[in-house]
């Protein structure tokens, strides 16, 4: 009986001793930090490319529909009407696009501190990041309508309460963001070594597409939204334009 008591006490002391050790809580030295991402020119370039990594493909998810129905439960959700903006798999952009937006702001806020990096290159990187911020907001707008505009970097631990902006406000903000990129360092043409990176032509083309979508009857005066829940919870003002305007954005597009 005494031996069992001694064994129990010994076990308690051992567990207490192990739990008090903090040598397992040390962050590994090789784990990258934000400072590592901007420690030199090459690291900054890698970080810029990581900002592009959030771009979705226009055909994303299409290969799922080339297989049998047994491969996915998408068809079942469609038939049952249980699809929502949050559970559409490869087509759910919300978290992914906002993660990309935050990364772009991180680059903008830190690239100036990169040592031995040409000032002109820093300006180009920030312009490309602004282009991506506009593009990611556009993808969100296309998928969800009125969205939360992120005009600054928000900490992952932030408790800031954010709300959706009216559709026309979102459109103007995105268009202005494309203009900001074009007017502040975005290259007219990229060299063949940087094929696929943002250019002024891409920004202007996407701005035109933004206006095309916004002026279409899908978003412009669609009566479907009159009875929806797309209203500002504080002012009770509609977030979607309820009256059709055939001249909407014509002066801006010109």
Name every feature range the model reports, one short phrase each.
Residues 40-41, 45-56, 75-144, 158-195:
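Conserved, well-structured interaction surfaces
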